[in-house]
């Protein structure tokens, strides 16, 4: 096994928020594979993240980001449980990353898939159900195919489904869970507004 570089440990720590020794151990266990190390850390820490997801998050920050060229601006509210966490630079940096992610994702309109209005999903369902390749399929298989296609078509609109700009191997939903584990309290991306010059 090759030596684990300090740079790799630093990258993993920035992504996951886990401690330096935990990152180093996870990288050793995964023979330096960053994706496998993230999975290892998730397995160790995300059980607590899932429990914490039900706690009320009323503290937090509102962060602004103006993209290069001054043509796109984003305001995002990211909540946590305590003002102690809200004041931490790591939390503010996470919120700034989310604002940058939104600015860099031109089609993102919703935080989670469940935030998409029912009428948009129904419209997609009608379009997909009229496709020729589904006409001779059994109804139960047809419904599963339609659901899969709707999910695929609409995932570009959902922030949680976007690959994280700093590490394409994880999406924003996974990043939020990793941050819940790191800060040891619930974290929520509550809302955002994107301004595009001329729109």
Curated annotation (Swiss-Prot):
Report what the protein is called. Answer: Elongation factor Ts, chloroplastic
Organism of this sequence:
Galdieria sulphuraria (Red alga)
Q: Which family does it belong to?
A: Belongs to the EF-Ts family.
Task: Kindly list the GO molecular function terms attached to this UniProt entry.
Answer: translation elongation factor activity
**Function summary:** Associates with the EF-Tu.GDP complex and induces the exchange of GDP to GTP. It remains bound to the aminoacyl-tRNA.EF-Tu.GTP complex up to the GTP hydrolysis stage on the ribosome.
* Entry keyword set: Chloroplast, Elongation factor, Plastid, Protein biosynthesis
Query: In which broad location class does this protein mainly occur, judging by the first location in its UniProt entry?
Result: plastid
Record bears the keyword Plastid: yes
- Choose one Gene Ontology CC annotation of this protein and give it: chloroplast
The question of whether Lipoprotein is a record keyword is answered with no
Query: Where does this polypeptide localize?
Result: Plastid, Chloroplast
Q: By its UniProt entry, which PROSITE patterns does this protein fall under?
A: EF_TS_1 (PS01126), EF_TS_2 (PS01127)
Which Gene3D superfamilies does this entry report, sorted A to Z? 1.10.286.20, DNA helicase RuvA subunit, C-terminal domain, Elongation factor Ts, dimerisation domain
